[in-house]
Amino acid sequence: MEVLDATGLAERLRWEDNDYWLHLEAETPFDKYPAKQHARRVQAKLGIEDGLIYLPGQPARNNEDSDMPAPFRQRRYFYYMSGCDEPDCHLMYDIRRDVLTLFIPRIKPERVIWNGRGSTPAEALAKYDIDQVHHSQDLTYIIQNWAFKHQHTSIYILHPSSRIPGCDNLMPRIDSHSLQPAISLCRMIKDDHEIKRIRKANDISSQAHREVLANIHKYKNEAQVEGLFMDVCISQQAKQQAYDPIAASGPNAGTLHYDANNEDLAGRQLMCLDAGCEYELYASDITRTFPLSASWPSKEAENIYNLVQRMQETCIERLEPGVRYLDLHIMAHQIAIDGLLRLGILCNGTREEIYKAGTSRAFFPHGLGHHIGLEVHDVGQAELMSVRRGKPVYQQAPSLYPENFHDPVYDSETCHAPTDPQSSHLEEGMVVTVEPGIYFSVYALQHFYLPSPIHSKFINLEVLERYLPVGGVRIEDDLLITANGHENLTTAPKGEAMLDIIRQGNPGTTEILNPSPTPPRRMRSENRTPRLRAPGISKKTLQPLLTPLARAATLPTELRQQDDIDFEPIVGPSLFSGFSRAMTTEEKIQQWKQKRDSVPTAPSRPTKAKNLSPVCGENTANVQHVYMSTVSDLSSLSQSSVGSGSTSMCKNCGILVQTLDRLRQNLSSSTQTSPKPMTVPTFESRQKSHTVEEKHREMVCTDSLLDKVSIGQSNRAIGPEERRRKAQSDHHHHSRLKAATGEVKSRFSTRYTPAGVPPLMPSHDQYSITRRPNPERMQPVADTPIVPPRHLTYMTSTPQQSTENPALADLGLPRASAEIAAIRATKQAGQEKLDTQRTTLDAFQDEGQRLVIRSRHRLIPQTSMPVLMSQNPYHHHSNRSHGREGNNATNKRSMIDSQPAERRTRPERPERPARDYVPGDEFLTR
């Protein structure tokens, strides 16, 4: 080991700048998916410097009406920015801080024995290119906390239907229209990591195609071909297919997406095998058409195969950056028309006439290709084959301007295109397919093209019938667009190499796990510069667009400026024409550092508010806040802090201080002008009411003494016949009194409280009667004055209207003298109150209620108190009606209070039999 000494330090420092640094890329699990770089690319496409990106992962679910789990397939937009292929995860990217956070579900111990466990936070941090890992339960809190600290920034989600769990209050700040186009533009250009995965998927699929070619003469059914292909893919750790394999033999090849794969191969000429696997979520798409024998079964099959192969090779030769893909599609149609004219299938017209009529779409109904990546028909497909529609629209051939891939349009009347169509230009880093084909669909020909006079005149039926058994031919490869041309990622054999494998039965010795480092590709000479380049491609070196990094830190690290990168825009129309150039990551870092260095120092807080919190709740350092410890200190703090310091005052604090001052003024003024509140009865007022009641009892007793002298003495002198007539007259008098006082019955309420205890709530009626439980039964005696029981007290309040009734004026009261008349008037008032009590008790009898309340086993029913059953069996036996009344006691009593008198005298209700009045009646005595 070399000993470090101070003498050699200067020499080492002098040669330090000349040292060479070695960069290594590991082909091991340490080669992480570049999620952090993808997030930065999305931020650059969005063109924002602050905000939050939220993406949910695919949740785990079961099949419908089943307890078996459905096949899990991660959401591709989520995977592009996270690299995580686990269910029930979430992703959050803080743009300003450049922090990528992954939320994973917490491990459930009860499910580990069944499904295994997921990643722990430490494992996820080491596995994925992310900065932080939290459990999913913390998602709502973290996002709400971020939103509170960033009041004026937006949150970007993928779709308008997307929702952040527990964050519905943030909907006004959510942008659901900008994120998906930005990620789609980024996904169109693949980086080195993505290209490696697509190449790996192509290698595995190509080997599976070789195995099928080597064993095709052994199989007798389409299902066997599909099974062998999937067997090879699964054995190479590619357990998922990018799409359902298409193993179409004979006429089935005329169906573009045939997937039954269950018919026998006997009597068929060709098989069209369209199949490709996924590797780490990246797809491959390969199609090969081959004979089911060692040689071509017919001349017609060989002719169609050679025509399709010429279409594909011609289009592939012209793949390079800046080429408009739609032009290649039109060129493929022109080659197909020339070939079909030469074979005699098309006739009676020139290439231009058939081209304008769109008859070639009968044999080539789909587009030339599509993007491929995380999806087999990856994002950007619409841009690749799109048509920019202008105002002048003319009828054109539908075969020239397809709107959707594999969306057949069989009539020219259903498709229109502008005179100046525009589509996407190819860019470096794109991976596209080139898949021309010639098909003979009997259904499409019979129902759309042959009945149409526009197309039928160009089709030779006699020759067409000979080519119908061919079914269809399609050849498809996956190609990477490079700076100098293209690279074919598909290594599956075709042409003569394909026939050699079928004849020999040997798939070859291609090693899948270690593919060739230099796959077949078409390269330009090095001394020839490319004509058109995508933005950001260097003129000097062919370095990749993105370089995989280690796990990203919370803040971006210092990166070196690369002077050999220019950003010259593409010449001519392009997908990026008219767009301003997005800033690179290095420029973003420099801009962030400048802003960080230019931030002024935060002013110190007031000394008296050292440990206080601002009024507005936001502790920002660029403005001066108002602090408060108590409510009384608010005005003084606001006056002292507004004019102090050179920094600007916090607007929110000023608004809150002014609002509180106005509230104080309004409260102070309202206390002077507000009406006098209702006072609660005091002990002295209750004593006064008891004094008035005692005086009323004395008056009633005096009236009873007079009855002893007059009425009582006369009762001993009259006979039985007169006593009966008097009872009838008294009953008539009682009926008149009851009819006269019926209109005020609704103003009386009965309330039962213990003796000496005032009612809990003041009555809103004019009169209120309180009654002791278990009153003594008082028997009237002829020579004894009738004194009302002591437990009957009358609580009077100021009436809202006069209780005088004209019917009370003609009751026939005797007037012996002025004193007797006054006493009689007082007696009459007491008698009216007693009649009112009797009327109220009659109402209880009408409702079928027997109110027997005993002093030791009685509860006061309240609205908020449940009715309890007494433990006394005798009380329970004699109080059945009270038990029924208990559950709704308050409602029934309020119903009696508010029930008008007319409801008791309705004609449909039978009259109660009249009660014979006798002076000793117990009911009247009570």
Swiss-Prot record:
Q: Where is the composition biased (Basic and acidic residues)?
A: 685-696, 719-730, 900-915
| Residues bound to Mn(2+) 1 | D285, E435, E476
Q: Supply the InterPro entries for this chain.
A: Aminopep_P_N, Creatin/AminoP/Spt16_N, Creatinase/aminopeptidase-like, Pept_M24, Peptidase_M24B_aminopep-P_CS, X-Pro_dipept-like
As cofactor, the record names:
Mn(2+)
A UniProt-annotated Pfam family: Peptidase_M24
The record's listing under PROSITE patterns reads:
PROLINE_PEPTIDASE
EC numbers: 3.4.11.9
Reaction catalysis annotation: Release of any N-terminal amino acid, including proline, that is linked to proline, even from a dipeptide or tripeptide
Question: What GO molecular functions are on record for this protein?
Answer: manganese ion binding; metalloaminopeptidase activity
Where is region (Disordered) located?
A: 505-538, 595-615, 668-696, 711-741, 865-926
Keywords, alphabetical: Aminopeptidase, Hydrolase, Manganese, Metal-binding, Metalloprotease, Protease
| Residues the entry annotates as binding Mn(2+) 2 | D274, D285, E476
Polar residues: compositionally biased ranges: 506-515, 887-897
Q: A GO BP term, please?
A: proteolysis
List, alphabetically, the SUPFAM superfamilies matched. Creatinase/aminopeptidase, Creatinase/prolidase N-terminal domain
What top-level branch of life does the organism fall under?
A: Eukaryota
Cofactor binding note: Binds 2 manganese ions per subunit.
Summarize the protein's role: Catalyzes the removal of a penultimate prolyl residue from the N-termini of peptides.
Sequence similarity: Belongs to the peptidase M24B family.
Q: What is this protein called?
A: Probable Xaa-Pro aminopeptidase PTT_10145
Q: Which organism is it from?
A: Pyrenophora teres f. teres (strain 0-1)
